[in-house]
Amino acid sequence: MSWKKQSMNRMPFIASFLLALASASHLAMADISTERQSELIYLLKQDCGSCHGMTLKGGLGPALLPETLYGKPKELLVTTILEGRIGTAMPPWKTMLTQDEAEWITVQLQQGVK
């Protein structure tokens, strides 16, 4: 069988895997209560805003707007939230946030925090 045919035969499997992965990520984020979501938005606007600007348009840290985050891998943003950035003022938040919460915050930032 040619390489192209082998690749085509794997496409349904790959598509199913990616769909399952996306669904699992969505379900994990859905477990964050409405109350906790409100707390996270407050944290984002107040704590993150103290460095990234109260409107998240930038300050000590870079802007956190959809257009400035466009194209950045979600995993990179989540890791930055949880682990911080060595050599910068960006602290790690892993003692205050779960992986799911960091993913939820990332989605909010990519969509534009309201």
Indicate residue ranges for each PLM-predicted region:
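Bacterial N-terminal signal peptides
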Residues: I14-A24
